[in-house]
Amino acid sequence: MEHKKGMENMDVKENDRKHYRGIEKQTDNPFLNLYHIDALGRDGTPFHYYFASRNDEDNIKHKTHSLRPEGMAVYAVTEDGQHLVLVRQYRYPMDDYLYELPAGLIEPGETASEAACREMIEETGWKLEVYEGGEPAFRRGFFLAQGLTDESGSMIFGTVTEQVGQQMENTEDIQVILADRQEAFRILREERVSMRCGLMLMQFLKAEKEAPFAFLYL
């Protein structure tokens, strides 16, 4: 018991130390900017740390410590529970196509669910009926690449009901995939896949067709 208490005290002491001396915005781009932190190691040695943010300088999470999600991704199944809606999208950093969940940014004044419905039509052409049941904590903001950016995103769940046609922007190159479980497993084995998509494909493989959102309940 004494050993455990000592470890807890060490953790508190470590968390209380000073981690940085200052922060500076280094770029002034429209959508994404680079920040430099004058960081301090555990022994006080200074080093350079860099991260990117979509937020303006006053709202970077380094300052606000907010969990507010900048974007969301959509776990959308067909009405029979047999297929998961994916996108295969060209991504410039990889110079290749990646399998992903439909996703996008939450616009000012939108809820995450409203953004999900809008993005589903834009990216896939499918109307989305949002599923609201289950544990609310599963829909809160979670950080995406915390070593590189302060961005967080939430997950929205639902069923696609009607195909009305894609409304992609000219800058987007997106193919819509309706993946059954056999195709989902193939994608996991063979394709280039985003982390969020990979995790939810694993979930889809184990989900019941008759109760596709049962995993949202504790």
What function would you assign to each model-found segment?
Residues 42-43, 78-81, 90, 159-164, ...:
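Short loop segments at secondary-structure junctions
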